[in-house]
Curated annotation (Swiss-Prot):
Gene Ontology molecular-function annotations: 4 iron, 4 sulfur cluster binding; CoB--CoM heterodisulfide reductase activity; metal ion binding
Pathway(s) the chain acts in: Cofactor metabolism; coenzyme M-coenzyme B heterodisulfide reduction; coenzyme B and coenzyme M from coenzyme M-coenzyme B heterodisulfide: step 1/1
Protein's UniProt name: Dihydromethanophenazine:CoB--CoM heterodisulfide reductase subunit D
Function comment: Part of a complex that catalyzes the reversible reduction of CoM-S-S-CoB to the thiol-coenzymes H-S-CoM (coenzyme M) and H-S-CoB (coenzyme B).
Cofactor, free-text remark: Binds 2 [4Fe-4S] clusters per subunit.
Every 4Fe-4S ferredoxin-type domain range: 14-44, 81-110
Gene3D superfamilies cross-referenced by the UniProt entry: Alpha-helical ferredoxin (1.10.1060.10)
Keyword annotations: 4Fe-4S, Iron, Iron-sulfur, Metal-binding, Methanogenesis, Oxidoreductase, Repeat
Source organism, top-level taxon: Archaea
């Protein structure tokens, strides 16, 4: 009789992750905080605890004592497909890791499980499966011409050919949310900061591939990271500035892992850079905004990397800004709903989560809901529009530009 093959494997799960799967006590604390579980009407399969329990059951059926004695129990394909849907119905925001009393690094676990399933031909979710081929071919997720990477640059913005600082624009700011690129570049010019950009040599950071379990597919993610690092080195830069939280997280956390070495330059978010300049009294404001502003922590910037205070410091020092906090902030903030591929794969779920976050902002009576991530901004705008709410959604760097008397158009 032919030996049965287990329906799943554990090849890309680390020893620590295998122990983490066993360490879940099923206390349910994560269930209370999960944004997609709440937004879905409490669909059981989306609860972090449930996903861990099911994968543990799959492992027991495949590799437990009974499986070793009598062979693995086959897991129906339909069941694995349903599990795939639930694993991808997660923004990988990391709130479950924050509240987990067993200390499980759930973000890493969810991404590993996604990768595991994709390697078995199960997933990714919906149109996410096109990411490796298209990003590998076009070097950006929008399928636009790389030669247009700097098409947004207005005549008044000065860019050096080489400099110690590279502004890594990101695909979204460079192609879609141009106000973010206008604001960042003009603020740097206004402050006398010499910087350069990579232009058509700037490739996608790879975040979309990594977050959706496709980090391994054709080695595209590694190729992107390697190319970008070499392009930055060629500019002679020692520091790279990011206004996109997703690019920042990918560069700071994922690139070193993919390449197996530390980066030869410093990775800095624009709010960290501005905080330092404000503390050194190097910013001379020109305009009072006279607005009440609240701030949404992007998961990639906050929980994933730990940058919580710089955006708040910057906002609180802008003339005329009354800064107010929402109920859930910093480590315990509510995700905007766009991360982990959910915006692309399950847009209705992403919108529902965004509506909840916009309601948090409305409770503060703020004029402006700010963030430091173009993906958060886009989804929060969608949530606001869906609610027909009267609140401005804007990036922190755009508010800085306005207070310096600069145009973002």
């Amino acid at each position: 009789m032919a030996k049965k093959t287990p329906s799943i494997d554990t090849k890309n799960l680390t020893a620590v992750q295998l122990m983490e799967l066993d360490s879940c006590t099923r206390c349910g604390e994560c269930v209370k905080w999960c944004p997609t579980y709440a937004a879905s009407g409490q669909k059981p399969g989306l609860a972090p605890r449930d996903k861990i329990l099911r994968w543990r059951q799959y492992m027991n059926k495949s590799y437990g004592l009974k499986a070793k004695l009598f062979g693995p129990t086959e897991i129906p394909q339909s069941e694995l497909e349903e599990f795939k849907d639930d694993v991808h119905g997660c923004t990988t925001c990391g709130i479950c890791a924050t509240v987990c009393e067993s200390g499980i690094n759930t973000v890493e676990l969810w991404e590993s499980l996604r990768t595991n399933l994709v390697k078995k031909g199960i997933g990714p979710f919906g149109k996410q499966g096109m990411f490796p081929k298209l990003i590998g071919q076009y070097h950006n997720p929008y399928l636009l011409d790389q030669k247009d990477r700097l098409a947004w640059v207005p005549p008044d913005v000065k860019i050096a050919d080489k400099a110690n600082i590279v502004y890594f624009t990101g695909c979204t700011a460079g192609y879609k949310q141009l106000a973010l690129a206008f604001a960042t570049s003009r603020v740097l010019n206004k402050l006398g900061i010499e910087f350069t950009m990579l232009g058509e040599d700037e490739w996608c950071c790879g975040s979309a591939l990594i977050r959706t379990g496709q980090v391994h597919v054709n080695d595209v993610a590694k190729e992107l990271a390697k190319h970008n690092v070499e392009a930055i080195k060629a500019k002679g830069a020692t520091k790279v500035l990011y206004a996109c939280a997703g690019c920042f997280r990918a560069s700071k956390v994922d690139w070193p892992r993919l390449l197996g070495e530390e980066l030869p330059f410093e990775v800095v978010h624009i709010t960290e850079f501005l905080e330092d300049l404000i503390k050194k009294d190097k910013i001379k404001w020109e305009k009072s905004l006279d607005k009440t502003v609240t701030y949404h922590d992007p998961c990639h910037l906050g929980r994933h990397v730990g940058v919580f205070e710089p955006p708040r410091y910057v906002l609180s020092h802008i003339p005329g800004v009354k800064f107010v906090e929402m109920d859930r902030v910093k480590e315990f903030q509510r995700c905007c709903g766009a991360g982990g591929g959910v915006k692309a794969g399950i847009p209705d779920l992403a919108l529902s989560v965004a509506e909840s976050r916009v309601k948090d902002a409305l409770d503060t009576n703020a004029d402006v809901l700010s963030s430091a991530c173009p993906f958060c901004k886009r989804n929060l705008m969608d949530g606001r529009d869906s609610l027909k709410a009267d609140i401005e959604v804007e990036d922190v760097i755009v508010l800085v530009a306005q207070a310096l008397g600069l145009s973002v158009e």
